[in-house]
Amino acid sequence: MFSADDFLGDDPRREFERLLVTRCRAGGAFALMLVDLDGFNDVSARVGAPTADLLLYEVASRLREMLSEHDAVMRSGNGEFAIFVRGMERVQNAERLANELIERVERPLTVSGTRFRLSASIGITLSPRQSGEWRLLLQDADEAVYDAKKQGRGHISISSAPPKR
């Protein structure tokens, strides 16, 4: 599990990249899922940073509940999370998990006395089936989440990067 200090650290993107490098070097199959909370910047601007941080923490907790102890959820930006799922080799399994994660995010939650309904878009890439180089994996997942967001709220897109040779 994670603590509030770990979650709300000064540079979550650096921690995220460090974990991605470590996972790539370790080898083995895993899924990288980038979860982007739809419209979160607007929500954050409306409610202020303290409430937005509590919202992010609650969403991260919900995501973590869906994973095993060998998997990881990290904040990768404002309203963005990276999820590493160890042993995930099949696109169908990754897609099924992503749908469950979206359903979990969409459940109403109350923070600081206000009820929120959020949605998320998810981009997925698999390693080592696609690319074992962390920057390429991140690029693939970024492109996939961008494609998901173009489809509208609550969508999933899977990287179409060519298989690793």
Regions found by a protein language model. Name each.
Residues 32-34, 158:
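Core hydrophobic beta-sheet residues of small sensory/regulatory alpha/beta domains
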Residues 2-31, 38-64, 74-78, 82, ...:
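Conserved long alpha-helical elements within nucleotide-processing catalytic cores of c-di-GMP signaling
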Residues 65-70, 103-115, 147:
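Short catalytic/binding micro-motifs of nucleotide second-messenger systems
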Residues 73, 100, 114-115, 121-129, ...:
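Cyclic nucleotide signaling catalytic output domains
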Residues 14, 132-135:
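Conserved catalytic/ATP-binding subdomain
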Residues 32, 81, 120-124:
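A structural signal for short, well-ordered beta-strand segments
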Residues 45, 84-89, 106, 127-128:
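Residue-level recognition of strand-loop junctions within catalytic nucleotide-signaling folds
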